[in-house]
């Protein structure tokens, strides 16, 4: 049983593309000292 319901919708389930994929490299723009950020996981996306 899933934690979140479908909201009563029926029909085809559309695939929502991710904003940032796993493995994306981003430039950091704050003063932490890091220059590049590497995405190692995307939270909340369940798939096969």
From Swiss-Prot:
GO molecular function, one term: structural constituent of ribosome
Gene Ontology CC entries for this record: cytosolic large ribosomal subunit
InterPro entries: Ribosomal_uL14, Ribosomal_uL14_sf
Keyword list, A-Z: Ribonucleoprotein, Ribosomal protein
BP term (GO), one: translation
Similarity section: Belongs to the universal ribosomal protein uL14 family.
Protein name: Large ribosomal subunit protein uL14
Gene this protein is translated from: RPL23
